[in-house]
């Protein structure tokens, strides 16, 4: 089971703070997971942004480690948690 945790605008667009993806539905790579999540959550934030628009701006933590700039290719085998962190504003 893979847990996906959403924060800030990603949480608003997804309509949930977290979800669990059954092992059989977890794709091989993070980029594929993000496509899957965007398709599963077509809603928008109050500002009218959808998850599909927010995800490219996000930072991703995979089991607590930053995925880095090559995040679409990060393997998800054996991963338990992905955090979706959009840019934060304010102090």
Where are these regions (language model features)?
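Ubiquitin-like/PB1-type beta-grasp interaction modules and other compact soluble beta-rich domains
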Residues: 1-90
């Amino acid at each position: 089971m893979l847990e996906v945790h959403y924060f800030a605008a990603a949480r608003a667009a997804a309509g949930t703070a977290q979800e669990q993806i059954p092992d059989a539905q977890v794709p091989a790579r993070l980029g594929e997971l993000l496509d899957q999540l965007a398709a599963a959550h077509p809603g928008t934030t109050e500002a009218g942004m959808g998850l599909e628009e927010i995800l490219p701006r996000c930072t991703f933590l995979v089991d607590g480690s930053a995925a880095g700039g090559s995040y679409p290719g990060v393997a998800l085998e054996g991963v338990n948690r992905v955090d979706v962190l959009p840019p934060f504003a304010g102090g």
